[in-house]
A protein has these predicted regions:
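Basic/aromatic-rich interaction segments and small domains that mediate binding to polyanionic partners
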Residues: 2-78
Length: 78
């Protein structure tokens, strides 16, 4: 596994494949009315696809069990 270095919103775009580095303490859905979800819906190392760029270094990532808002520091590009 090769880390690409610190990610920024300039280095990532919609459609980029990313891997979750570690399981967060909770998940926030990327719906219009967000909800907090338990962290066991996705596992560390799971691969997802960026579907939207958000403010404050956050991205919406689609995994097999849902689309969630995550900080860039929690992800690595593939």
């Amino acid at each position: 596994m090769v880390l690409q270095g610190p990610m920024s919103q300039e280095s990532i775009s919609v459609g980029t494949q990313v891997r979750l580095l570690q399981q967060p303490s909770y998940l926030k859905t990327a719906d219009a009315m967000s909800m907090l979800r338990p962290p066991d819906l996705i596992d560390a190392g799971e691969i997802g696809q960026v579907v939207a760029l958000k403010a404050l270094e956050q991205v919406a990532v689609r995994f097999r069990r849902g689309t969630f808002l995550l900080e860039l520091k929690q992800l690595e590009t593939l």
